[in-house]
Design a protein with these regions (language model features):
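Alpha/beta-hydrolase
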Residues: 137-216
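Short beta-strand/loop motif that positions the catalytic acidic residue
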Residues: 221, 227-229, 233
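Conserved hydrolase catalytic core segment
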Residues: 93-135
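Cap/lid segment of the alpha/beta-hydrolase catalytic domain
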Residues: 61-77
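Catalytic active-site module of serine/aspartate enzymes centered on a nucleophile-bearing elbow/loop
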Residues: 251-280
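Conserved HGGG/HGGXW glycine-rich cap/lid loop of the alpha/beta-hydrolase fold
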Residues: 12-66
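Conserved acidic catalytic loop of the alpha/beta-hydrolase fold
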Residues: 77-95
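Conserved alpha/beta-hydrolase "acid-adjacent" motif
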Residues: 234-240
Length: 280
């Protein structure tokens, strides 16, 4: 995996990952990481990516890993950062794949970048905060409620929450915990404090971005879109996936009974195969 630092005109740096620099014969798939994670593409999918002809691209969102923080960032502004990344790499069109909050960033990018996006696959994506008809907090675990309600009260309140010493309990299901004993135990190498060497700005700004206007219209997504969600997800409950499916013109929803926030990734490889099928 090639890693580079992309210097932007505003002085910020984005830390970028590319599995096959300059290989235009592969389908570029941009990975959008979860909260809080590094942006390195998912190792558990590398083998499948090889036989599917995938070129993995990723980047640490601002405030994570080697990327400069950008307080006040939105889904749309991160989509603009993605544009700078793919332009710098010489990539014209590409597919998007995102997990958890990263799924929402993938959807935002698809809305902003339009025809450059060939397909989108998300796993446990979160719906917009102003989603009409959705009880946004319903079904969330207590730690998630506290964290996101702090973000909804403003960035200063979110900073106080994250620096108060409060512990986050994800309340993973048995199916989720079993995933850590297999290939997706990889998440432990990129999540949590490992993704925030310079402090919690990435986490703070992710959560704040979920509860403000996204700056893009999801109805403008033209790429075929796969939404995967587990019915037992207490971090981002499955009604978020249902709402997205009902409001995205090109979306297909796969609901998985009994799966939670991590265990839904058991279907990530089939999601990658779906992307390949959509793009030819």
């Amino acid at each position: 995996m090639d890693e580079t630092d992309l210097r932007l005109a505003d002085g910020r740096t984005l830390h970028v990952y590319d599995s096959a620099p300059g290989d235009d014969g592969r389908l570029a798939v941009v990975w959008h990481h979860g909260t809080p994670n590094l942006g390195v593409p998912p190792e558990p999918l590398f083998e499948a990516g090889e036989w599917l002809g995938i070129r993995w691209i990723g980047f640490d969102r601002p405030g994570y890993g080697g990327s400069t923080a950008a307080p006040g960032r939105t889904m749309a502004s991160v989509a603009a950062d993605l544009t700078r990344v793919v332009d710098a790499l010489g990539v014209g069109s590409f597919a998007l794949m995102g997990y958890s909050g990263g799924g929402s960033y993938a959807l935002g990018a698809a809305a902003v970048l339009g025809e450059r996006v060939e397909a989108v696959a998300t796993f446990a994506a979160i719906a917009p905060y102003d989603a009409d008809g959705l009880d946004w907090y319903d079904g969330m675990i207590p730690s998630g409620l506290a964290s996101l309600r702090a973000a909804a009260a403003g960035r200063d309140a979110k900073v106080r929450h994250e620096t108060s010493g409060v512990e986050y309990d994800p309340e993973f299901t048995a199916a989720d915990l079993a995933m850590f004993d297999g290939p997706w135990g990889w998440l432990g190498s990129v999540a949590g404090d490992k993704s925030m060497p310079n402090g919690p700005d990435g986490l703070i700004d992710d959560d704040c971005s979920y509860v403000v206007p996204w700056g893009c219209d999801l109805a403008k997504i033209t790429a075929p879109t796969l939404l995967a969600h587990g019915t037992d997800d207490g971090i981002i409950p499955s009604p978020h996936g249902q709402w997205l499916a009902d409001h995205l013109p090109t979306a297909k929803l796969d609901l998985y009974p009994g799966l939670g926030h991590v265990s839904v990734l058991a279907h990530a490889e089939s999601g990658l195969e779906w992307i390949r099928e959509q793009t030819g």
